Amino acid sequence: MNKSESLYAAAQQLIPGGVNSPVRAFNGVGGTPLFIERADGAYLYDADEQAYIDYVGSWGPMVLGHNHPAIRDAVIAAAERGLSFGAPTEMEVQMARLVTSLVPSMDMVRMVNSGTEATMSAIRLARGYTGRDKIIKFEGCYHGHADCLLVKAGSGALTLGQPNSPGVPADFARHTLTCVYNDLSSVRAAFEQYPDEIAAIIVEPVAGNMNCVPPLPDFLPGLRALCDEFGALFIIDEVMTGFRVALAGAQSHYGVVPDLTCLGKIIGGGMPVGAFGGKREVMQALAPTGPVYQAGTLSGNPIAMAAGFACLTEVAKPGVHEKLTALTNQLAEGLLAAAKAENIPLVVNQAGGMFGLFFTDAESVTCYQDVMKCDVERFKLFFHMMLEEGVYLAPSAFEAGFMSLAHTPQDIDRTIEAAQLCFSRL
């Protein structure tokens, strides 16, 4: 038994499933999860000191790579001044100024502690601002584990939502409508059925929780137009895509302006941070200036703000996103060529610094139904083969991969070589 196996056995006696977030348990691929000892640059080192090229990046935040000196130094300096005050700090003002300067659709921003808090709060704000109860989300999109968002479609796209987790009351779920990602007709039908009841649409601009599915050209502009037509707010969940697909987020890359934006992951530089913001008129409905309540003991934590400010300062430097996209292109093109050489049907989707692998005979993957037709069993085999070759992919066929600025062309060449070897064995 290696150390990861020993630690996992102990963890299962103390922590539900042995992990503090379900996907880490490797249930999607089988086997024992890696317990990580340390990380540096593009590499993870497990408890047995095995090194892996990392394409998970802590599920997105580590866009600069692990243990980046600017972030590390900022955290150390902030910690020397105190860990938490429960009072406003200058760094909160600086962070808010930086975020709103980078994302033009955000006139004001409120800091929270996670992406789930950001989406949950944005939806509450949208409901309070509009005086409406229903929201629209999309099949295959994940916006955190708030009750109103753990909802699946019913027998049809317009069926009132049904909970997909025990513990979520049906009365909560019925206010959530689930439509088809990249299908505007399903969204229009929902609005026409409930024209005065829908407070907001919430959408991942690139669906990163059914692997990686970018929007079709007319999808996001079409959602914006429908919200305007029916008086609903347009919420873009950039927890995963923010500062990764483009500096101002996927919304700038795809040319749409939301009413509210949710942020997380990169905004904290590896620390637990979320944020939501948008139009001044809407944001001023939040307490203490307005009636919509939202609060948090650790919101705006000085350590987290220091890490986030350092990270965004680096990310905002010229050429960063061009480099990130070029590295992702190199990986995607290399994987496709390697798969073709071994007669393995593969689709690779990408958007900026994120990507997704789909074992499928289809020419493209554009929606949840396409994703569900992919060969999950083949992915499981591929995942473990790549792990043996020292490459750490997301341990699920339904999670996106992430590039960092710490990856080198040589790291990517090594990854492609490993993939071709694994493809030859599938």
Curated annotation (Swiss-Prot):
Cofactor(s) this protein requires: pyridoxal 5'-phosphate
GO molecular-function terms, A-Z: glutamate-1-semialdehyde 2,1-aminomutase activity; pyridoxal phosphate binding; transaminase activity
Main location: cytoplasm
GO cellular component, one term: cytoplasm
Pfam family, one: Aminotran_3
Catalytic activity: (S)-4-amino-5-oxopentanoate = 5-aminolevulinate
Locations listed in the record: Cytoplasm
Annotated EC: 5.4.3.8
Pathway connected to this protein: Porphyrin-containing compound metabolism; protoporphyrin-IX biosynthesis; 5-aminolevulinate from L-glutamyl-tRNA(Glu): step 2/2
Modified residues (N6-(pyridoxal phosphate)lysine): K265
Keywords associated with the record: Cytoplasm, Isomerase, Porphyrin biosynthesis, Pyridoxal phosphate
Gene Ontology BP, a term: protoporphyrinogen IX biosynthetic process
SUPFAM superfamilies: PLP-dependent transferases
Quaternary structure annotation from Swiss-Prot or TrEMBL: Homodimer.
Sequence similarity: Belongs to the class-III pyridoxal-phosphate-dependent aminotransferase family. HemL subfamily.
NCBIfam families, per the entry: hemL, PRK00062.1
Protein name as catalogued: Glutamate-1-semialdehyde 2,1-aminomutase
The species this protein was found in: Pectobacterium carotovorum subsp. carotovorum (strain PC1)
